[in-house]
Amino acid sequence: MSVPDPASAIEVKEKEKEDAEKFSFMAPVTKAPKKQIQFAEDMQEFSRFPTKTGRRSLSRSISQSSTDSYGSAASYTDSSDDEVSPREKPQTNSKGVSDFCVKNIKQAEFGRREIEIAEQDMLALISLRKRAQGEKPLTGAKIVGCTHITAQTAVLIETLCALGAQCRWSACNIYSTQNEVAAALAEAGVAVFAWKGESEDDFWWCIDRCVNMDAWQANMILDDGGDLTHWVYKTYPNVFKKIRGIVEESVTGVHRLYQLSKANKLCVPAMNVNDSVTKQKFDNLYCCRESILDGLKRTTDVMFGGKQVVVCGYGEVGKGCCAALKALGTVVYVTEIDPICALQACMDGFRVMKLNEVIRQVDVVITCTGNKNVVTREHLDRMKNSCIVCNMGHSNTEIDVASLRTPELTWERVRSQVDHVIWPDGKRVVLLAEGRLLNLSCSTVPTFVLSITATTQALALIELFNAPDGRYKQDVYLLPKKMDEYVASLHLPSFDAHLTELTDDQAKYLGLNKNGPFKPNYYRY
């Protein structure tokens, strides 16, 4: 038997040591307990903040806060303070003012940063502020508003204040308010009454607090959906004796105004912002084209490629939704009542079907019609398991959610703004935001596009407030074409765009003023 060489043994051991160091990343971890203890401490640190459903896990904390901070700062709203209604909590801002009701005034600093970020992409409103530093066209205006309360609308509200107006504000949607932004507005002195997750009773209470003031009488209304206008007509009709005009943003609210006008019950001029070119062709189309995907991804993590989706309605909102979904490889069906819109959908490459014909096979149902009961209980009963149902229209009437609140169906909240409605046989439908507006309830929207709409609203308020007697009668009006063009021109510098100027001869040939308007009122963009 041969005797091993000691020198060789040493070389072998050194070689094994080198290999162990070289490939140490492949070796099993043997000193994990210390790391695990440290990780457990980290989890305890994150779990110190309770939620309604118990302690929040580390991974869910990170996911929830990073996802929801854009919409409502979930890190704030998921606290034990949720158990106490803001109506029951006395709050004052740093100046001792208490004429507001928000979730938590302590969030104001964070909300101010959100507003400052939005201002960077809303340069048209900032330009309006600068141009009106000397002359304040809204001096004397007392504007009561009911819109979504987000960082973008906060820039609009503060612009109106900078132009001389006094404002009182509530939310037009119980889920779309950014609590930190509402707090920042309250800290700045705006009488704001809104928080995310209001009850129906809270919703009308907030509107009432904006209107029912003995020492403060509104003379302008800025509405989104018509709820504020409806409340004033129903509860305080005498307020309209001093109202100079109404500015309405949404198709739902505009429809209600035209109904009032047709019944000869509209007693003040109203400006239809929804059908202005700068709202229809930009906000309704481009905003929805980007935000529909954002809302669906944040709430459901859905994979779009290969999915079958039906979009109810092919107006500008429907067009934006369909374009976004088609680009990601979905099979898109469209339902329509209007043959012109239906033909547009066909020529854009979409199958136009009745909802009953595709309801069993689609994976996602999106409504954007502005109508009621577009998706009925019968449709919901026939949907496939795990079908996602959501709404991109303003009102929550498009999906018959009330029909789902019956004893035989079980509601299970699985995420913020995500409910599983479970049938007795185990089938479940995924309902987003309880049928309310998806993008502002569950995600966020592009700031630049909202700048266009907000600037249009500001100019409409200025026009109605300063219009001489007799210019506008008790009817619904579109924004003058010249103002639409002015709004567009304010946003062109962001793209370094340079307009071509007509020569005198060209202007004469076209029968136009060199400075616009450049299209007749009947022109379809």
Model-inferred region functions:
Residues 173, 337-338, 395:
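Residues in the short beta-alpha loop(s) of Rossmann-like NAD(P)-binding domains
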Residues 146-165, 280-283, 287-372:
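Glycine-rich phosphate/diphosphate-binding loop of Rossmann-like nucleotide-binding domains
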